[in-house]
Amino acid sequence: MLNYDIAVIGGGIAGYCAALNAIEAGKKTVLISQGQSALHFSSGSIDVMAKTPSGERVEAPFSAMASLPQQHPEHPYSKMSPNFVRQSLYWLVDQLKEQGLPLHCQQDESNHHRITPLGTLKATWLSQPFVYQHRQNVAFKRLLFVAVDGYRDFQPLLAKDNLKKHPDFQHCEIGEIQVTIPGCEALRRNPNELRSIDIARLLKQPQAFNSLCHQLMKHATQEDLVIMPAIMGNGDGLVLLQQLRRQTNLTLHEVPTMPPSLLGIRIEEALQKRFLKQGGVLLKGDQVLSGEWDAQGHLVSISTRNLGDIPLHANAYILASGSYFSQGLKASLDKIVEPIFGLDMVAKPHRRQWRNDQFFSASAHPFMAFGVETDAMFRPSLNGQVCQNLYCCGSVLSGYDPVFEGSGGGVAVSTALAAVQRAMGLKQAMSVEEECVL
């Protein structure tokens, strides 16, 4: 039998944050991850709260959280103080900064808006260094979208047309720069075959990188905002972007593209390296299949696909297995389940109640708020019995819609730390009424 203090199930942002926080507290920690997480599909920014569950726009997320316990007691934020959520996010900033990936927020802790690949604006709270943080005033003479020849996952014409409709940008000239990356011809068999990873590898070559610099300087000036797809990554994306800024003296804005998202991959790689550097044990490419319980509701051990007959024991377990995309939740024709342990769920019983009649509805689809039911300590239940040493965090939780609210990142990080601290018996410092010290 393998023995640990804390075992974390899931390798997304919630899982890595939980595992890192546990190992910082001196706990022998293992993280079991099936493989690539939803971070490969993410924007690389951390959303905290763009809208309330009722649909009201939010500028100051921590102020908005204060009313959630009364209005939406089922929401994960209602089980933590706003100050704990805030400190959890700053903890993440410190962790990523140590790995060379700084994240930035506004000085007044309000939301800012990032320009999306579709040319819309999306509220978020933390962004990477080369993401333009828009509030209201635009200080640029022109906005120039970069179109890469042969790259199909970013459509500048669509983004340009959408951004022109926004009142904040109506006085700006919005244009397009067409660039060609040397070496692309050898990689593709048809005109639109390149992906972001392909271009990222090419731009490591000095000839390709210098050619991009020259083409950008030919069309853009220091008064412009150059909006380019995230095509620099594969381990050294920020280094190359800093070099690009030095050589061109241009203001750059990265937008995430169709998967794989290099902005999201940066966060996953940084968290993984941090966890391993701190001495954590990573079982990557493995899958938790089941658990063994005692009569009092304690999870005694878990079994994984790769370990076979060897059980894995821990004093406490953190379930950060994600939602539908990561198979932390599974939907069949007539029910939605948590597939590892069969935990009790919050979900509508009839399939017609899972969604709105209109796909592009102004209100949230109910199924997005389905998930595992937990108590105030983020402990789930199994057949009505509270699981004494299993804690849940991230998008496996019920009671919130991360897409509609724009709250996915904030909930993932804060509930991960809350789950770990409650697993270690620090629940008194975690109540909504009290301040939390990390």
Curated annotation (Swiss-Prot):
Pfam families noted in UniProt: FAD_binding_2
InterPro entries the UniProt entry points to: FAD-dep_OxRdtase_2_FAD-bd, FAD/NAD-bd_sf, G3P_DH_GlpB_su, Metab_Enz_Cyan_OpOx_G3PDH
Cofactor: FMN
Keyword Nuclease carried by entry: no
GO biological process: glycerol catabolic process
GO molecular function: glycerol-3-phosphate dehydrogenase (quinone) activity
Superkingdom of origin organism: Bacteria
Keyword Hydrolase annotated: no
UniProt EC number: 1.1.5.3
Keywords annotated in UniProt: Flavoprotein, FMN, Oxidoreductase
Cellular component terms (Gene Ontology): glycerol-3-phosphate dehydrogenase (FAD) complex
Pathway: Polyol metabolism; glycerol degradation via glycerol kinase pathway; glycerone phosphate from sn-glycerol 3-phosphate (anaerobic route): step 1/1
Enzyme class, UniProt record, top EC level: oxidoreductase
Catalytically driven reaction(s): a quinone + sn-glycerol 3-phosphate = dihydroxyacetone phosphate + a quinol
Family annotation (PANTHER family): ANAEROBIC GLYCEROL-3-PHOSPHATE DEHYDROGENASE SUBUNIT B
Subunit-structure text: Composed of a catalytic GlpA/B dimer and of membrane bound GlpC.
Function statement: Conversion of glycerol 3-phosphate to dihydroxyacetone. Uses fumarate or nitrate as electron acceptor.
Family: Belongs to the anaerobic G-3-P dehydrogenase subunit B family.
Protein name: Anaerobic glycerol-3-phosphate dehydrogenase subunit B
Gene coding for it: glpB
